[in-house]
From Swiss-Prot:
The keyword Heme does not apply. Mediates the transport of CDP-ribitol. Does not exhibit CMP-sialic acid, UDP-galactose and UDP-N-acetylglucosamine transport activity. The chain crosses the membrane at residues 19-39, 53-73, 86-106, 143-163, 181-201, 215-235, 249-271, 280-300. GO terms for molecular function: pyrimidine nucleotide-sugar transmembrane transporter activity; transmembrane transporter activity. Residues 1-18, 74-85, 164-180, 236-248, 301-324 are cytoplasmic. Found in a complex with SLC35A2 and SLC35A3. It is a multi-pass membrane protein. It catalyses: CDP-L-ribitol(in) + CDP(out) = CDP-L-ribitol(out) + CDP(in). Keywords: Golgi apparatus, Membrane, Sugar transport, Transmembrane, Transmembrane helix, Transport. Its main location: Golgi. This is Probable UDP-sugar transporter protein SLC35A4. GO terms for cellular component: Golgi apparatus; Golgi membrane; mitochondrial inner membrane. It holds the Pfam family Nuc_sug_transp.
Amino acid sequence: MSVEDGGMPGLARPKQARWTLMLFLSTAMYGAHAPFLALCHVDGRVPFRPSSAVLLTELTKLLLCAFSLLVGWQTWPQGTPPWRQAAPFALSALLYGANNNLVIYLQRYMDPSTYQVLSNLKIGSTALLYCLCLGHRLSARQGLALLLLMAAGACYASGGFQEPGNTLPGPRSAAGARPMPLHITPLGLLLLILYCLISGLSSVYTELIMKRQRLPLALQNLFLYTFGVILNLGLYAGSGPGPGFLEGFSGWAVLVVLNQAVNGLLMSAVMKHGSSITRLFIVSCSLVVNAVLSAVLLQLQLTATFFLAALLIGLAVCLYYGSP
């Protein structure tokens, strides 16, 4: 299994086992984010400022990276790396920041179900940029696997759950509220295309600079999250009046922040030693974890559409990673 396939060539079996464990752990943590966030809701809304949670997540990543550097400083190569190598990570942080904010603005121009279905186009944009920017070629078998991933995401988003007692699958709505009709405006479509392109570009660009630089991953993360903290601090300061910095935080909110921070570090290892395609499979496979936790913690019922999505994901994994 090659690096691009999500494995580590030439590694001894214990190291390969640790790599596989890391992939499973990242998948589980990615899938747990939405259910944990739902458990934070009070009266149907998030009681804290989202910008506070994002800033705390970036700060946690930065502190974990700094601690890792302090612990392993004796194993570093001699000499101080030139700080100009930090500059490329400013663009990476900017792309991630733009992507996160576009998600918020997209909700104004389309309904949530339309967004969930169409946002799976980022799988195609990531694969296209992966081939164009990194010079990799995907076989017809691998291309079909990625198409199956897109179809699985669309199936899952279009009706993987239903509320107990509800005969039709679909997104939950407030009691007594009329369901929002499916819609998307021309501006919303343009923003969605931009979102998918930026999502793919941020992933591929980060992979490119991480693999080109011969620097420890912890130092690269330090560069990335330093810029991330600066950017999100500015976004928080400019977000206008609202709850205080830690107002509304609960134990579940702290768990959301820690989960996102640790998973961000795991994802950076995937980008350094794996590939953007590996990341796509982690995100897609996390739908299964998301569904199981939503059923257990939120009492949502799985529908036949979910099992179809899970089947498509399994087929995609077999096609992409299996022997021809």
